[in-house]
Structure formats: C-alpha cells, structure tokens
Amino acid sequence: MQLFCETSDIGSRPSVATIGFFDGVHRGHRYLIEQVCAVAAERGLASSVVTFPVHPRKVMQADYHPKLLTTCDEKVSLLAKTGVDYCMMLDFTPEIARLSAREFMFILKERYQIQALVVGYDHRFGHNRSEGFEDYVHYGRELGMEVLLARAYAYSKEASVTEVTVSSSAIRGLLQEGNVSEAAEYLGYDFFLDGTVVGGYQVGRKIGFPTANLRVSDSDKLIPCDGVYAVRVCVEGKEYGGMLSIGYRPTLENGPDRSIEVHIFRFDADIYQQPMRLSFVRRTRPELKFDSIEELIAQLHRDEVEIKSILSL
C-alpha cells in the first residue's frame, strides 16, 4: 500500500475509493474495503481509501476529545493489511468541513483521480452531512464519477442468530466496560495498547510480582476500564503471556495517577525504555482494595492461576 499525505505528489493511477475515519479498522471497515477492491478489480482500476489523521468531529467541535481505538500510525498499518493499493491521508481542516458534498467530490475526482466512489451504507459527508446517497449519485453523474452504495456488514455472534451492527462507537463502549473479548470479535483482532516501558514504584518486585509499567504513546488512545486482564505482551520481538492491572492501586496508595502495569510470565529482563505492546484477551476482575498487602498477594496468586489457564500457559 502506498500512503499519500496532503502535501505528497499524488502519483497514483485512477482508482475506486471509499471515504471514512476508519477508527479501529474493524470487520465492518474491512468488508467495505473488500468491496472497493472488488469493484476496482472489475474495472481495471486501483483501490483507494481516503481518510484523515484527526477525527473530523475534533476539528468541528473544539471541546470534543475522543478516545480512539487506533492512533493514526496504527490505523495506517491495519489498512495496509487489507490489500488496498493507496491510502490518501487528507488533513480535515475547517475549510474542508465547509465544503459541500459536490465540492468535495470534485476535489477527489480532479486531484486524486478517483473515478468511482463506494459509499458506506450509513455514511454521509459534506457540510453538515446534509446530503445523502441519491445526491452523491447526482453529483457523480455531473462530475463523471461513478457512485456505488456498499452492502452493509452483517455480523452474527457465535451461537446466535441475531445480527449486530459493528461500529467504532460500539467497540469503544465495550472496551470502556472492560468487555475486551467481545470487542475483539467486532474488531477481528485483539485490542492493543502500544507504548514505552517506564519506571514505577518497584512495589511489585518486593511482593513477588515484578511489573513493567506502560506509558501509552498517544494520549488520545482509549484505555479499557480499570481491572485485571489476561494479555499477550510483545517486547523485544517476542511474545509472552501477562497479567495486567489498570487502575489506581488502592491497596498500595501510590498516588493519584492511573497506572498500566503488567506482570510478564517467565520473563526477567530489563526492558526499561523499550517499546511494548499489550494485546487484551479477557478481563478477569475489577480493581479491588484489600485490607492488607497479604490479602493482595493471595489474590495475585489466584489471578496468576486463572490467567495462565486462559492463556493456556
């Protein structure tokens, strides 16, 4: 996949494209992109995704501070795995926000050589999102751009005949509840946090459960709700099982800051300042306050047994 930014020389060939923010690049997004690639193959054109580095609503609403499933770099990496030919990263500015749908489509056609546009079944664009699919088709005829409506993605949970709508907002809600396993079903992969290992209070080592503390690389990244999780840890190019705690360590009273700290099984290397990825498998319990350190240690041993079983370790 080739990535073109706002200031890039757009050397792409004519393409079939779709537009969206694509936070999380979940199953629904990938189904839409599959349709783009299929139409492109039928017409002998390239396939493109048009997206934005910053959430459009953040530009239009100064007090909106979204917590996102993926950073911009993570999103690009996931898009590259879809097989799409081009990713066109447009800066969503107030000027772009004021464009009508027709004006925006004109830019896509003339600057980015987009010959056909596949519109998500529930997607709207243009100033105030006031126009709909029939309007896009009409403008497309005027501009010489084919406009197609994508099929909706229908996802059925295991052992259920009920279809659910997969959306980034629904996945965010699941993660904020700690339901990381169901979020993974919608995403099609385990939700993850990337960051750097930083220094902590060293209490974990004193009680027999040394931890690596993660500083997340992007402040806009969503962090699941407080609690204990079974996770997979990728560090120094290898994967390990881990027992993760997110929260404020109420038993230890180490200060007001929220911590993300993981005890990595069968691991004892110094990884301070190293990059690390945590992939969430299951939340096992909420954060609890214990009456003594001894009670905390006993619970950590029970957590270890349960999480090793979940991870088949």
Predicted regions and their residues:
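Glycine-rich, Lys/Arg-enriched anion-binding loops that position phosphate/diphosphate groups
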Residues: R141-G247
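N-terminal Rossmann-like or analogous alpha/beta NTP/dinucleotide-binding catalytic cores
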Residues: P56-L143
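Residue-level signal for inorganic ion chemistry
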Residues: H26, L79, L117, A183, ...
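N-terminal catalytic cores of NTP/NDP-binding nucleotidyl/phosphoryl-transfer enzymes
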Residues: S8-T71
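Phosphate/ribose-recognition catalytic cores of enzymes acting on nucleotide-derived substrates
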Residues: G200-L313
